[in-house]
Regions:
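Small-residue-enriched hydrophobic alpha-helices in membranes
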Residues: 1-165
Length: 165
């Protein structure tokens, strides 16, 4: 069994539900000792990304750097991400169930930009995230409008197009 240099730290951070700047630096130091990220450690970082919402401002760049380096530059063939790796990542990040976070959007964008020949599914996922984000923004705008004008929304005086709701 491959050991994870970061597993115990990740578990503590998930339990605490908060990642501070010092925690990101500790993870960076732990990973710097002993070479590149293992598959288990990549999974540990994804687990932290999925389960903790209160993240240090340093987290996004750390997460994207570590994961992009792992998928694009440490694996063979260099400069590529396979469909299999992309599906593993999408599943582990919960892209199809819980949606994307700013870190996962940034990661997919960087993977797309750094890949020599990005798989079609990567662009499709990025396009899907953009569409979902726009849809959520429209829903927030409609909800805000209805909260400002509750009498119109409750009396049926305001028609909301189905694509907005």
């Amino acid at each position: 069994m491959t050991k994870s240099r970061i597993r115990s730290t990740i578990s503590l951070l998930i339990e605490r539900q908060k990642v501070e700047d010092a925690d990101v630096e500790r993870l960076r130091d732990l990973l710097a000792a002993g070479g590149g990220l293992s598959t288990i450690e990549a999974g540990d970082l994804v687990r932290l990304e999925r389960h903790v919402r209160e993240m240090s401002p340093l987290w996004l760049s750390f997460f994207v750097e570590q994961m992009a380096t792992y998928f694009i530059w440490e694996r063979r063939p260099t400069g590529q991400i396979s469909e299999r790796d992309l599906e593993w990542l999408a599943f582990r990040l919960g892209l199809d169930s819980t949606g994307a976070t700013p870190s996962t959007r940034a990661l997919l964008t960087i993977l797309s930009e750094e890949c020599v020949d990005p798989p079609p599914n990567l662009k499709k996922r990025l396009d899907g995230l953009s569409g979902a984000r726009a849809r959520r923004q429209r829903q927030r705008e409609v909800a805000a409008m209805l909260s400002i004008m509750p009498s119109l929304g409750s009396q049926g005086g305001l028609a909301v197009h189905p694509s907005l709701g």
